[in-house]
A protein has these predicted regions:
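Short alpha-helix in the alpha/beta-hydrolase fold that links the catalytic acid
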Residues: 303-306, 329-338
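N-terminal cap/lid subdomain of alpha/beta-hydrolase-fold enzymes
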Residues: 61-129
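Catalytic active-site module of serine/aspartate enzymes centered on a nucleophile-bearing elbow/loop
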Residues: 343-373
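Alpha/beta-hydrolase-fold enzymes
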Residues: 186-188, 192-277
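Catalytic-loop region of hydrolases
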Residues: 33-75
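Conserved hydrolase catalytic core segment
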Residues: 163-201
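Conserved acidic catalytic loop of the alpha/beta-hydrolase fold
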Residues: 134, 138, 145-164
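Short beta-strand/loop motif that positions the catalytic acidic residue
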Residues: 313, 319-321
Length: 373
């Protein structure tokens, strides 16, 4: 019912910001890294909102030494955020890898790429076998529950009955909470970072603003190539970035160097740079779909409400908030912790807003390290 393909791991150029991280262990051929694989589900995959796909693909990365029955290693599963990928060593380099907090030698570490992503898992940028062209808007709408179900297919394919530790930040946190409810006996311990359990009007407003930005690009609806909507994507990313960061963070990094300049531009050029940076590695159609999946987040839907759904979680949970997070204010994480039996709450101090979950590595390590199996 499945097949998989193994790819060699890639090493960034030595001049990248991750060069030191890779250099630390690349001198020894015996050190283990995460490798890229693909899971192909040959049955029909039915989507929650309707529609189906045959041959659903989920790209994932895992520790190089394969998981085996009766393996003594503990399983750590990482759920990534909106535009990240399954190569957690790439976007969380201080925490994932040999000798790091999530040690890919000591543990069997897995990270699956979300459905709808531009990094290989099935989504609007995938090729429709009926047309030989990308699906674009013919791909079914994706919910958080669809993403979790697809990830669970990978878990079953790997032969993993229990996930000893799960961690996710932002939309990765959505997945972690939802998974704890959908498969309550599977996840032993989890850390939910900077996330919510029901999409707020505030968050939906941001998502709609980004969709509007994409739709203003006339090439977006033409569906002529995956470069369609590129300028709209840059604008959407600029909008998103404001929600990810904070007033204090911008003030700490984006003041003009010339106090006498007539027209401030440093922060503006930074927004344009970040917009182009995303459009160089992502596509507008995947972004559009993933924003839609965020709007589906509601753990209480069909379960009697959010509080009742959270009350069914049997996973040992730690919830982490960030004091400067404007996208998911700490009130949301405190609420989550108050509804889950036995959950604990921690708060990170950061000037970087929501993105603090990617940057405040020392504080995260202090919280997570004592919880690891």
């Amino acid at each position: 019912m499945f097949q998989y393909i193994i790819f060699a791991a890639r090493f960034p150029d030595k001049n990248t910001i991750f060069a030191r991280f890779f250099h630390d262990f690349s001198e020894s051929d015996n050190r283990l890294i995460m490798i890229r694989k693909e899971y192909i589900h040959n049955d029909i995959f039915e989507f929650e909102a309707g529609g189906s796909v045959e041959g659903l693909k989920v790209v994932y990365h895992c520790s190089e030494r394969p998981w085996q029955e009766a393996d003594e290693r503990k399983v750590i599963w990482i759920c990534h955020a909106l535009t990240a990928n399954s190569d957690a060593e790439d976007w969380w380099p201080e925490l994932v890898g040999p000798g790091k907090l999530f040690d890919t030698e000591k543990y069997f570490v897995v990270c699956a790429n979300m459905l709808g992503s531009a990094y290989g898992s099935s989504g609007p940028s995938s090729t429709d076998p009926k047309t030989g062209k990308p699906y674009y808007f013919d791909f079914p709408k994706i919910t958080v529950r669809d993403i979790v179900r697809a990830n669970s297919l990978v878990r079953k394919h790997l032969g993993i009955d229990k996930i000893d530790f799960m961690v996710g930040g932002s939309i990765g946190g959505f997945q972690s909470v939802e998974w704890s409810i959908m498969e309550p006996e599977v996840i032993k311990r989890a850390v939910y970072i900077a996330c919510g359990v029901r999409v707020t009007p505030w968050l939906t407003a941001y998502n709609e603003s980004m969709r509007m930005a994409l739709e203003t690009d006339p090439t977006f609806r033409e569906c002529a190539s995956l470069k369609g909507g590129e300028n709209g994507l840059r604008c959407a990313r600029s909008i998103a970035l404001i929600s990810y960061r904070s007033y204090e963070g911008y003030n700490a990094t984006q003041w003009e160097k010339d106090e006498d300049c007539m027209f401030a531009d440093r922060a503006g050029s930074y927004q344009r740079y970040q917009g182009k940076k995303l459009s160089d590695r992502f596509d507008a159609y995947s972004y559009y779909y993933l924003c839609g999946s965020v709007d589906s987040n509601n753990v209480g839907r069909g379960r009697g409400g959010v509080e009742k759904a959270l009350g069914t979680i049997r996973t040992e949970c730690t919830v982490v908030g960030i004091d400067s997070d404007r996208l998911f204010p700490v009130e949301e994480q405190r609420f989550i912790a108050s509804c889950i039996p036995g959950a604990t709450y921690h708060e990170i101090t950061s000037k970087f807003g929501h993105d603090g979950f990617l940057l405040e590595n020392d504080q995260l390590t202090a919280i997570i390290e004592p919880l690891l199996p």
